Amino acid sequence: MSWIQKILPRTQTSHKGNVPEGIWTKCGSCQAVLYKSELEKLQEVCPKCDHHMRITARRRIDAFLDDGDRVELGAEHEPQDVLKFKDSKRYKDRIVAAQKSTNEKDALVVMQGKLKGMPVVVACFEFAFMGGSMASVVGARFVAAVNACLENDMPLICFSASGGARMQEALMSLMQMAKTSAALAKMSKKGLPYISVLTDPTMGGVSASLAMLGDINVAEPKALIGFAGPRVIEQTVREKLPEGFQRSEFLVEKGAIDMIVDRRDMRDRLHSLLVKLHYKN
């Protein structure tokens, strides 16, 4: 202890209590600091600027469907490394890592349940699983969703969030574009409604197939939607793209999608759309 510390009076310092981790989060758009618990109640939509943050597939389904009996479809389908693919890492290892981090077997979750009492099937992409990439299991589960609708005369709603086809499955991944499109043609032939909801981001092979084949194509605000990304396009055409290019507001203005719906209003709006499509069950 120094001589100055001996002669100066001691002051009582209050110790701040430890703040538990995971209570706060920051909006990626307006940088507002938000309570995580409040944000969860708002379905991950910022109360300050209405920025739609990414949400897990199961949380989206839980918020969208009625409480009560639900049946998961296609869960028996699990990914296989048929090609023994390896880039900087083995595909098999990437699958295991993605399964551990998301607690999902693959990038699509399909659930049969009810929307305001109306029987429906909901397919929802899990973007955290390898960028929501479409591979064999995603195609198989989507077809399982369509088959359930065909067998029970139910509408299908799909929430897309994907970077496109999964590179590690090569042509088998690309084949899912044709497979899912052919399945949806059967729904159209039978007159069953299919509503596609495009969320941030919906790109590549998913946007070029099942995501744009809805009887009504809906998007969340400011969602990035397209085939190639804006940077790739700019480098290819060597021109500056218009502001907001490939965002949902730009696309609805140009007629590429039908409407933009806030996530918090999605249940009401989609139920209303199904009623207007004269769907009855």
Curated annotation (Swiss-Prot):
Cofactor(s) essential for the protein: Zn(2+)
An example Gene Ontology CC term for this record? acetate CoA-transferase complex
Cofactor-binding details, from the entry: Binds 1 zinc ion per subunit.
Any idea which UniProt keywords this protein has?
Answer: ATP-binding, Cytoplasm, Fatty acid biosynthesis, Fatty acid metabolism, Lipid biosynthesis, Lipid metabolism, Metal-binding, Nucleotide-binding, Transferase, Zinc, Zinc-finger
Which top-level enzyme class is recorded in the Swiss-Prot or TrEMBL entry?
transferase
Pfam families in the record:
Carboxyl_trans, Zn_ribbon_ACC
GO biological process, alphabetically ordered: fatty acid biosynthetic process; malonyl-CoA biosynthetic process
Chain ranges of zinc fingers (C4-type): 27-49
Enzyme Commission identifier(s): 2.1.3.15
Domain CoA carboxyltransferase N-terminal: start-end pairs: 23-281
The intrachain disulfides are none
Which residues does the annotation say bind Zn(2+)? Answer: 27, 30, 46, 49
- One MF term from GO for this chain? acetyl-CoA carboxylase activity
Q: In which pathway does it act?
A: Lipid metabolism; malonyl-CoA biosynthesis; malonyl-CoA from acetyl-CoA: step 1/1
Which reaction equation describes what this protein catalyses?
Answer: N(6)-carboxybiotinyl-L-lysyl-[protein] + acetyl-CoA = N(6)-biotinyl-L-lysyl-[protein] + malonyl-CoA
State where it is primarily located: cytoplasm
**Family per UniProt?**
Belongs to the AccD/PCCB family.
Subunit details? Acetyl-CoA carboxylase is a heterohexamer composed of biotin carboxyl carrier protein (AccB), biotin carboxylase (AccC) and two subunits each of ACCase subunit alpha (AccA) and ACCase subunit beta (AccD).
Q: What does this protein do?
A: Component of the acetyl coenzyme A carboxylase (ACC) complex. Biotin carboxylase (BC) catalyzes the carboxylation of biotin on its carrier protein (BCCP) and then the CO(2) group is transferred by the transcarboxylase to acetyl-CoA to form malonyl-CoA.
- Identify the HAMAP family for this entry: AcetylCoA_CT_beta
What's the protein called, per UniProt? Acetyl-coenzyme A carboxylase carboxyl transferase subunit beta
Organism, as annotated:
Alteromonas mediterranea (strain DSM 17117 / CIP 110805 / LMG 28347 / Deep ecotype)
